[in-house]
């Protein structure tokens, strides 16, 4: 029995499902989840001392690679001064100044402790600002596990939301409308009928929880136009895309300005951090300035601020994102070439240093239906074949992949060699 198998058996005694986040259980790909004990650069090392080129990156935060020395030094330095104060610090102000300078739409920002907390707070703020209750989200987009967002609508565009998780009251979920991603006509129709009741539209500008689906031409522009027309707050959930697809996130990459934005992952440098912010007029509704309450014991935690500040400064250097995007493109091109040579139907998608892999014969992946039509069973086999070859991908056909600046030519060759062997077995 491997160490991971033994640890998983032990974990299941007192941890539901043996994991603290469902995707880690390998339910989507089968087998025993790997337990990691160390990570360095572009690699993760499991409890049996096997090394893997890592394309999960803790689900996005590790854009510098694991254990970057300057980030570790910043955290060590802060450790000498205490773990948490529950009071304002200079680093919080420095972080706010830096985030607002990087992302022009962020006129004010509030730090929180997770991406879920950021999206939950942004929606509450939009409701408080507009005095409206309904929200619009998109099929296949995940915005954390708060009650109002664990909803998927029925087949009609205006079908009231029904919970997709037990424990979410139907009366609460009914305020959430779910529309098809990349379908601006559905948005126009919905807002024409019920726009006066809608507080906000929240969207992943690149849908990262149905693998990686970039916005169709005109989709984000259409959202901005429709929100302006109907007085609806436009929220970009940039928990995944922020500081990754470009320094200024997806809004910088695509040139669209939201009213509010949420961030997580990279902004904490690997620590549990999120933030939300946007227009000063809207942010002025947050307590203690306004009537919308939001608070958190560990918000602005100094250890997290030290890691996040250092990370944001390092990725702000000229050329950083160009280099990272170029590596990602080379890797995806290499995978596509090898799949084509093996005669395996395969499509890749990319937004900066974020990517998607689909076993599909489609020309492109644009909609939720395109994603669901891909071959998840073939992905399962591919995932395990890549593991055998020393490459760790997201253990789900519906999760995005991430590269880091620590990935280089050596890691690229390991990846492409493993993929060539895998595709040959998938014919």
Swiss-Prot record:
It comes from the Bacteria. The keyword Transferase does not apply. Pfam families: Aminotran_3. It catalyses: (S)-4-amino-5-oxopentanoate = 5-aminolevulinate. Pathway: Porphyrin-containing compound metabolism; protoporphyrin-IX biosynthesis; 5-aminolevulinate from L-glutamyl-tRNA(Glu): step 2/2. GO terms for cellular component: cytoplasm. InterPro entries: 4pyrrol_synth_GluAld_NH2Trfase, Aminotrans_3, Aminotrans_3_PPA_site, PyrdxlP-dep_Trfase, PyrdxlP-dep_Trfase_major, PyrdxlP-dep_Trfase_small. Its cofactor is pyridoxal 5'-phosphate. Its main location: cytoplasm. Its EC number is 5.4.3.8. Keywords: Cytoplasm, Isomerase, Porphyrin biosynthesis, Pyridoxal phosphate. One of its GO terms (biological process) is protoporphyrinogen IX biosynthetic process. The keyword DNA repair does not apply. The modification N6-(pyridoxal phosphate)lysine is found at residue 265. One of its GO terms (molecular function) is glutamate-1-semialdehyde 2,1-aminomutase activity. It is found in: Cytoplasm. Homodimer. Belongs to the class-III pyridoxal-phosphate-dependent aminotransferase family. HemL subfamily. This is Glutamate-1-semialdehyde 2,1-aminomutase. It comes from Pseudomonas entomophila (strain L48).
